[in-house]
Amino acid sequence: MLFDLFKALVLGIVEGVTEFLPVSSTGHILLAERIFDLDQDNFWKTFAVLIQLGAILAILAIYFQRLWRVATHMFTDPAARRFVIGVLVAFLPAVILGLIFGTFIKEVLFNPWVVCFSLIAGGAVLLWVDQQDVNPRHHDAMAFPLPMYLGIGIAQCAAMVPGVSRSGASIVAAMLFGADKRAAAEFSFFLAIPTMLGAFVYDVYKSRGDMTMDHAFIIIVGFVVSFITAIVVVKTFLDFVTKNGFTFFAWWRVIVGTLGLIALALGA
């Protein structure tokens, strides 16, 4: 029991730290499960899905006032309505491709080798984009043009490959379309809400047979840890990238991916 609580604590921290950073939470969770030898355990796979809700609620808590204003004014305020439409437009590509290829991706691509190669490749792309000398044109994540929302949504589909990073793909796309670094990061948070909620509901429905009340306390621990960690990380992350960009996270990806490949090659 104590070791299970320790695993729940570690996985909750990993989820909360990595979910909204451009480093791939799925990739890090898969590697953590490999370290604890949990990658074939159905309960822990379900646990990894459930604790995502803690991270989602962290975003809702941080941006509650802005999101509440959008929700209460979307029928009277054109700007609020355009933002809601933009998020839905960005969300749809992942829904369509997820329904078509979701099972194939989980059965074929969810393995540590793919994760490690994706971490390295994504790190190289993030490093390249971060070092481009561009003059950003868009500074408000709630006021991007509709075609830009669609482009970000299409780019986010790359994150169906574990290790790519949902937030990383959307941040890279937003910056290439002319968003400043803070706005790119913030929109990745907003887009995460429907994307992660949709994936959460779908995965919970499919995994409902693997959950029992015997696991309730372990799940609560992971959920709370994920929520608290995500709040701290998101608030710190925005200030950090505004001042320093994404180079640190690009090298984080490359180093973790490289160490993972070495460990796998040695039979870990």
UniProtKB/Swiss-Prot annotation:
The chain crosses the membrane at residues 43-63, 85-105, 108-128, 141-161, 184-204, 217-237, 246-266. It is found in: Cell inner membrane. The keyword Cell membrane applies. It comes from the Bacteria. One of its GO terms (cellular component) is plasma membrane. Keywords: Antibiotic resistance, Cell inner membrane, Cell membrane, Cell shape, Cell wall biogenesis/degradation, Hydrolase, Membrane, Peptidoglycan synthesis, Transmembrane, Transmembrane helix. One of its GO terms (molecular function) is undecaprenyl-diphosphatase activity. Its main location: membrane. HAMAP family: Undec_diphosphatase. Catalyzes the dephosphorylation of undecaprenyl diphosphate (UPP). Confers resistance to bacitracin. This is Undecaprenyl-diphosphatase. It comes from Afipia carboxidovorans (strain ATCC 49405 / DSM 1227 / KCTC 32145 / OM5). The gene is uppP.
